[in-house]
């Protein structure tokens, strides 16, 4: 009985002890002195957090956050470092977020606890100081663009981000813009006599894509004097460029004191494509004071294709160009008719490639001249003044009348001179050609003045419907189709029409004698299938 009493007493004591122990176990306590953390993207400062707890704890956080400790027991002051969220000043980075999590409880307490601290880091936003406008919006922006295009400036502001082209968004009137065109006329180029090399200096050529989106640029009224080897146009030099879908007009006034080239749209085109452009207004020149080439073109002054260096060869193309500009051009002291003369071509003044690179051509295709030419220069044509080397004229038409007061010219309404590795195909002249100088001693032909090189690559589909008038009483080098066909190149499928007047009197031409009036032929046997169409 005594033993039973002792056991009951012991159990009672143990129960009391256990009850006492349960009452002494506290709840886990855990708190921090920050409810959130915000840090900068660049050079973020460290942050200290005071942890108060009666527990063992562990810490987790994003990989871009580095804590001073990841576990511990009881109170602690924790320091946090943050990785930069900045790459460079040109790169945008996104803001990022995460949380710092501290979990407590375990061996020291009976219950666990968790605290979280949201952490946010700012991103970096690049603000372009010169953001793209998507294109050229007005005349003021165009003025800025054309200066940048001719001086090597950034064109990003006017480049459409979807197409990568400089895009004209509206019609532009430049007449109210103050642009120093003379200052932009500083590009120079040099080449040897046969144009076997070409070096462009003092400028950064335009090498992009300009898309006029069929808008008009009016009020282009430069007055410029060119010095030695200088070239000038709305675009001084186009190199590996495309210029398309634009109409340009104004009064283009340019003269020279030395060898120079100018075109209303492009001064010099190298390995470039110029397509679907229209040129209007007026082209005026008092010529040059030098006995060196001064070529002006309605579209382009000087076009080049072929070898520039060991790593670059290329072609140049004019396609779908229409010139409506009226021309007044007095050659000044240069009244010669050779390669060093003052010259004008409705599409281009002078086009060439190196002799050794006949495969890479300058091509003028599907182009039309409607502008009349009132001039006093040794070479003048509605399409191209000089096809020097490696040039193709295909499907071109001249509708402009030429009145020329030069004493001794080489005049043709499509092209004046055609030479090495050049081709004429489907060339039509509807314009009249009048040489008005007393005692005129030069040549005049409806299509061309002179084809003298033995290695011309072909002539076919030549058609003249214009009237040829001259005071050259000899009349030897005056013809409906050409003045001087001085080679043996096969020429075929042509149409001879129009009229010839010599010293005011009309020359009788009919089905019976028209082959005598197509022009001088060194070898008549090489000319075949020429059809006579009586003029209306």
Residue spans for each PLM region:
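Bacterial Sec-dependent N-terminal signal peptides
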Residues: 3-7, 11, 15-38, 116-128
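Surface-exposed binding patches on compact interaction domains or structured appendages
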Residues: 29-34, 48, 52-81, 86
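Short coil/turn motif common to extracellular beta-sandwich-like domains
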Residues: 42-46
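Hydrophobic residues positioned within well-ordered beta-strands of beta-sheet architectures
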Residues: 47-49, 78, 98, 115-117
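Intrinsically disordered, low-complexity serine/proline/glycine/threonine-rich regulatory regions
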Residues: 81, 109-111
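A short beta-strand micro-motif common to beta-rich folds, especially ectodomain repeats
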Residues: 91-108
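Surface-exposed repetitive/solenoidal architectures
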Residues: 123-536
């Amino acid at each position: 009985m005594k033993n039973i009493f002792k056991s009951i007493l012991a159990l009672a004591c143990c129960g009391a002890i256990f009850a006492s122990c349960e009452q002494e176990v506290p709840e886990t306590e855990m708190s921090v002195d920050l409810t959130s953390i915000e840090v900068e993207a660049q050079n973020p400062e460290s942050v200290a957090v005071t942890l108060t707890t009666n527990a063992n704890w562990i810490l987790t956080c994003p990989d871009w956050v580095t804590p001073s400790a990841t576990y511990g027991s009881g109170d602690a002051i924790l320091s946090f470092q943050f990785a930069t969220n900045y790459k460079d000043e040109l790169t945008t980075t996104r803001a990022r977020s995460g949380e710092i999590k501290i979990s407590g409880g375990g061996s020291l307490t009976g219950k666990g606890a968790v605290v979280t601290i949201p952490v946010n880091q700012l991103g970096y936003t690049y603000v372009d100081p010169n953001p793209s406008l998507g294109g050229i919006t007005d005349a003021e922006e165009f003025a800025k663009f054309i200066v940048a295009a001719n001086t090597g400036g950034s064109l990003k502001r006017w480049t459409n981000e979807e197409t990568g082209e400089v895009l004209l968004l509206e019609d532009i009137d430049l007449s109210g813009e103050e642009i120093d065109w003379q200052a932009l006329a500083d590009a120079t180029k040099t080449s040897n006599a046969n144009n076997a090399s070409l070096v462009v200096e003092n400028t950064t050529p335009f090498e992009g894509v300009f898309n006029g989106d069929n808008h008009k640029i009016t009020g282009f009224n430069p007055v410029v004097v060119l010095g030695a080897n200088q070239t000038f146009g709305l675009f001084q030099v186009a190199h590996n460029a495309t210029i398309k879908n634009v109409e340009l007009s104004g009064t283009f006034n340019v003269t020279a004191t030395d060898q120079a080239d100018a075109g209303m749209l492009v001064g010099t085109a190298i390995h470039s494509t110029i397509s679907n452009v229209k040129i209007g207004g007026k082209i005026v020149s008092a010529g040059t004071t030098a006995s060196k080439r001064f070529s002006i073109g309605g579209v382009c002054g000087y076009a080049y294709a072929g070898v520039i260096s060991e790593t670059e060869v290329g072609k140049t193309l004019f396609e779908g160009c229409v010139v409506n500009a009226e021309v007044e051009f007095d050659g000044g002291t240069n009244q010669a008719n050779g390669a060093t003369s003052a010259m004008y071509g409705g599409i281009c003044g002078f086009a060439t490639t190196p002799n050794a690179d006949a495969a890479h051509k300058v091509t003028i295709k599907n182009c039309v001249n409607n502008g009349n030419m009132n001039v006093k220069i040794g070479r003048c044509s509605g399409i191209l003044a000089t096809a020097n080397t490696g040039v193709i004229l295909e499907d071109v038409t001249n509708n402009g009348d030429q009145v020329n007061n030069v004493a001794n010219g080489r005049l043709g309404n499509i092209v004046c001179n055609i030479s090495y590795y050049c081709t004429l195909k489907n060339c039509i002249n509807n314009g009249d050609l009048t040489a008005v100088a007393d005692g005129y001693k030069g040549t005049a032909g409806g299509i061309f003045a002179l084809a003298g090189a033995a290695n011309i690559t072909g002539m076919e589909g030549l058609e003249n419907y214009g009237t040829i008038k001259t005071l050259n009483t000899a009349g030897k080098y005056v013809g409906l189709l050409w003045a001087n066909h001085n080679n043996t190149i096969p020429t075929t499928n042509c149409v001879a029409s129009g009229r010839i007047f010599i010293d005011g009197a009309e020359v009788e031409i009919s089905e019976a004698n028209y082959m005598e009036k197509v022009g001088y032929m060194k070898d008549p046997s090489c000319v075949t299938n020429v059809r006579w169409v009586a003029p209306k």
